[in-house]
Amino acid sequence: MKLLAMTVLLLTICSLEGALVRRQAEELSLQRLVSQYFQTVTDYGKDLVEKAKGPELQAQAKAYFEKTQEQLTPLVKKAGTDLINFLNNFMDLKAQPATQ
């Protein structure tokens, strides 16, 4: 009877140890996965910074901003003029009833 109890106890301990080892292995694989993810993101960021330092990309960005400024400047000036005219019309409408 004691031998049977010792055998059951030994098998239980071995199975629990095996489960503990598997659980630790799963945690390590999760840590490894997260570590690889952060390493990939870091490498991608470094590559992006190196590409942004290139003169070709800077020249493209400068040309884009200049083109945008050329297209938007007349629109902004026209919008400003229209706004001033609109406000002047309100001022004239308020001034007319007061003089009558």
Curated annotation (Swiss-Prot):
GO molecular function, one term: high-density lipoprotein particle binding
Compartments where found: Secreted
Endpoints of the signal sequence: 1-18
Record-level GO BP terms: cholesterol homeostasis; cholesterol transport; lipoprotein metabolic process; positive regulation of phagocytosis; protein stabilization
GO CC, alphabetical: spherical high-density lipoprotein particle
Tissue expression profile of the protein: Plasma.
Swiss-Prot/TrEMBL keywords: Cleavage on pair of basic residues, HDL, Lipid transport, Secreted, Signal, Transport
Recorded family membership: Belongs to the apolipoprotein A2 family.
Subunit structure: Monomer. Interacts with NAXE and NDRG1.
Function, as annotated: May stabilize HDL (high density lipoprotein) structure by its association with lipids, and affect the HDL metabolism.
Protein name: Apolipoprotein A-II
Organism: Panthera tigris altaica
